[in-house]
Amino acid sequence: MMLPLQGAQMLQMLEKSLRKSLPASLKVYGTVFHINHGNPFNLKAVVDKWPDFNTVVVCPQEQDMTDDLDHYTNTYQIYSKDPQNCQEFLGSPELINWKQHLQIQSSQPSLNEAIQNLAAIKSFKVKQTQRILYMAAETAKELTPFLLKSKILSPNGGKPKAINQEMFKLSSMDVTHAHLVNKFWHFGGNERSQRFIERCIQTFPTCCLLGPEGTPVCWDLMDQTGEMRMAGTLPEYRLHGLVTYVIYSHAQKLGKLGFPVYSHVDYSNEAMQKMSYTLQHVPIPRSWNQWNCVPL
């Protein structure tokens, strides 16, 4: 059975229910949170049953997924209370179009088995990417206080070093800056990623530092799941703590709007892990997962 959730009441109940399953449900919780705040990406939430759902899938409307090669748009966020038994639901052709290039995102590494099994059945190849998920301390305090029990947060800690404000000006990104983000984004560098970046800039709060030329030298964006993403710094401005300043400022901005604040870092990116530690972001290992699926 497949049940699209209609109306504000159902979606608010879903958000409340997902909140009880954090941090395992974070990627879906963040997406549903923004569906309930105007749904700027025009997404839908589908469950296997209601109200006692086992699995929830959030994805774009069918009419928005017309490009079979655009996995940036053809993206599904998934949370399951029963990852071992969600394979049948995920395999339903009305739910996920396995003939497209697509990506699945989840805070649950345990979904891997179901996705790998489906790859064999539906004949597509799958590449899993796993990263460290970080939650801002303020968000963790509100949503998952148990994650902070063993953490000692200094009351005035978590702030970046001051920057030269004569030289750099805090600002927001403009859609004309998308090419810059696309050039340095690990998952980007193509025409479809450029369109996705443009949409994120037009839709969600962004943050950047403008350099002496009045153009961005460092930036941070947000995606449809509410995650801070695509941070970058021009090579000649690296190692000056600018990205720490931008991410701190962006997190403050999102926090003031009442948004859950979280991000991810590659296991090999020690500089960004150190930065997350400086800003007192709370690490949740193995909790950022993406599966890129390509039909054979």
Curated annotation (Swiss-Prot):
Any GO molecular function: glycine N-benzoyltransferase activity
Pfam families: Gly_acyl_tr_C (PF08444), Gly_acyl_tr_N (PF06021)
EC id: 2.3.1.13, 2.3.1.71
Biological process annotations from GO: acyl-CoA metabolic process; benzoyl-CoA metabolic process; glycine metabolic process; monocarboxylic acid metabolic process; response to toxic substance; xenobiotic metabolic process
Alphabetized Gene3D superfamilies for the sequence: 3.40.630.30
Subcellular location: Mitochondrion
SUPFAM superfamilies recorded: Acyl-CoA N-acyltransferases (Nat)
PANTHER family: GLYCINE N-ACYLTRANSFERASE, L-COA N-ACYLTRANSFERASE-RELATED
Main function: Mitochondrial acyltransferase which transfers an acyl group to the N-terminus of glycine and glutamine, although much less efficiently. Can conjugate numerous substrates to form a variety of N-acylglycines, with a preference for benzoyl-CoA over phenylacetyl-CoA as acyl donors. Thereby detoxify xenobiotics, such as benzoic acid or salicylic acid, and endogenous organic acids, such as isovaleric acid.
Identification of the protein by name: Glycine N-acyltransferase
Organism listed in the record: Homo sapiens
Record lineage: Eukaryota, Metazoa, Chordata, Craniata, Vertebrata
Gene name tied to this protein: GLYAT
